Amino acid sequence: MTEQKVDWEPVIGLETHVQLGTNSKIFTSASTSFGDDPNTHIDPIVCGLPGTLPVLNKKVLEFAVKASMALNLKIAKHCKFDRKQYFYPDLPKNYQISQFDEPIAEEGWIEVEVAEKGKETYLKKIGIERLHMEEDAGKLVHAGSDRLSGSKYSLVDYNRAGVALAEIVSKPDLRSGREASEYASEIRRIVRYLGVSDGNMQEGSLRCDVNISVRRGPNAPFGTKVEIKNMNSFSAIQKACEYEIKRQISTYESGGIVHQETRLWDETKQLTKSMRSKEGSSDYRYFPDPDLGPIEVSVELQEKWRSELPELPSSKRHRYAEELGLSVYDARVLTDDYQMARYFEIVVLEGADPKLASNWITGDIAAHINANKKSFENLLLTPKQLAEMLLLISQGKISGKIAKEILPELLEKGGSPKELVEERGLGMISDPKVLGAIVDQLLSDYPNEVESYRGGKNKLQGFFVGQLMKKTSGKADPKLGNQILTKKLKGE
């Protein structure tokens, strides 16, 4: 394939399906529990059997409105549900209840930080066209293949059918695979901070479809749009976009035609494959659902839900950098995980230095959590205990080396760092008389090195510092020890 040329501009929009974290489904009391035996969470309403009537789950409405507010969308005065008609085995009713022309919210935006390779990080405002509520479909399992083509037979699990979704449709404001990936990442951060979804891509709680075309320059008409599905990571979103951009440019430049279609991303082969021609809205024959009346969210209810919104990740990043003096990178890493950010803030409230807390949390503690598949929520080392350890370091009572020695036990069992240090006799030696006596002994042990130092080999200072730390098992106060060494080496 030919490389992307300067005169071609990609145009990308994302449809992000967020599974809302309610205990029951959108129109029925059936459970939303993930990973249970197939077809154990279905009922007559999910299957659309005659005589059943759907009833909107109020928690779904609350989560959808809160997500809309966080995305700066305007909440509609009233909205309605529609039936989207299509035949596919994973849809037990042969129609999906969605929102067509009157969604819950429209016209919003978010800002994302984009770090393109070889470029400076920049902020970009991405428009959001709408957010609408709908029900999820079931899941097909193909025997002998990961798709229908090539499989011996298919099984259908309706446990997911009827689970509440919020579909977030961006405007075609994205111009690269990296921007698309960063936008999707920020959407996930936001819904996790709100507590409306776990955003788990591996479990299908957050799924993205990419709509992509290319055109000759920013003022040219949009090209033919292609939809890409089957991306289960942010890296896959970026790679799929980059591949499809090159494919479309190559097609146009060789005189071919880009067809409006749905394509699948093949993670193994790192390319997109044609799946089917893309349907238009008329193919779905939308009409208002006669079993569900229009919805109106009162101003009072909107204000109540708005007052419950937490501080969002973009605001936290800015505050950490401006008020706590953290680097942009550290602020981003901390706020990427809501539980990590919450843990960090409690540690700082307990009196720990923000930069020191950030280093330990994003370093050793995050590494422990990742290696042991834990989370900050169930960490045995409480924020208060970590703050206690960091204060011991700041006050010069233990060294960073000693802190690293006791950290594994604290992570496994919890407990007071101060008591552990006292119990093991690991406290810092900061008494000038005690350190002075140790330095005197050290200098008498290495007379030749002392003579060389006094002869002008000042680099031997590092050797003596190392020996001092070795002799004290790392417990000597580094600053005070260095001062005493310097004076005694100079014969003062």
Swiss-Prot record:
<dbReference type="GO" id="GO:0070681">
    <property type="term" value="P:glutaminyl-tRNAGln biosynthesis via transamidation"/>
</dbReference>
<dbReference type="InterPro" id="IPR017958">
    <property type="entry name" value="Gln-tRNA_amidoTrfase_suB_CS"/>
</dbReference>
<dbReference type="Pfam" id="PF02637">
    <property type="entry name" value="GatB_Yqey"/>
</dbReference>
<dbReference type="InterPro" id="IPR014746">
    <property type="entry name" value="Gln_synth/guanido_kin_cat_dom"/>
</dbReference>
<comment type="similarity">
    <text>Belongs to the GatB/GatE family. GatB subfamily.</text>
</comment>
<comment type="subunit">
    <text>Heterotrimer of A, B and C subunits.</text>
</comment>
<dbReference type="GO" id="GO:0006412">
    <property type="term" value="P:translation"/>
</dbReference>
<dbReference type="InterPro" id="IPR018027">
    <property type="entry name" value="Asn/Gln_amidotransferase"/>
</dbReference>
<dbReference type="InterPro" id="IPR023168">
    <property type="entry name" value="GatB_Yqey_C_2"/>
</dbReference>
<dbReference type="InterPro" id="IPR042114">
    <property type="entry name" value="GatB_C_1"/>
</dbReference>
<dbReference type="InterPro" id="IPR006075">
    <property type="entry name" value="Asn/Gln-tRNA_Trfase_suB/E_cat"/>
</dbReference>
<keyword id="KW-0648">Protein biosynthesis</keyword>
<dbReference type="InterPro" id="IPR017959">
    <property type="entry name" value="Asn/Gln-tRNA_amidoTrfase_suB/E"/>
</dbReference>
<keyword id="KW-0547">Nucleotide-binding</keyword>
<dbReference type="GO" id="GO:0005524">
    <property type="term" value="F:ATP binding"/>
</dbReference>
<protein>
    <recommendedName>
        <fullName>Aspartyl/glutamyl-tRNA(Asn/Gln) amidotransferase subunit B</fullName>
        <ecNumber>6.3.5.-</ecNumber>
    </recommendedName>
</protein>
<dbReference type="InterPro" id="IPR003789">
    <property type="entry name" value="Asn/Gln_tRNA_amidoTrase-B-like"/>
</dbReference>
<dbReference type="GO" id="GO:0050567">
    <property type="term" value="F:glutaminyl-tRNA synthase (glutamine-hydrolyzing) activity"/>
</dbReference>
<keyword id="KW-0436">Ligase</keyword>
<dbReference type="Pfam" id="PF02934">
    <property type="entry name" value="GatB_N"/>
</dbReference>
<dbReference type="GO" id="GO:0050566">
    <property type="term" value="F:asparaginyl-tRNA synthase (glutamine-hydrolyzing) activity"/>
</dbReference>
<dbReference type="InterPro" id="IPR004413">
    <property type="entry name" value="GatB"/>
</dbReference>
<keyword id="KW-0067">ATP-binding</keyword>
<comment type="function">
    <text>Allows the formation of correctly charged Asn-tRNA(Asn) or Gln-tRNA(Gln) through the transamidation of misacylated Asp-tRNA(Asn) or Glu-tRNA(Gln) in organisms which lack either or both of asparaginyl-tRNA or glutaminyl-tRNA synthetases. The reaction takes place in the presence of glutamine and ATP through an activated phospho-Asp-tRNA(Asn) or phospho-Glu-tRNA(Gln).</text>
</comment>
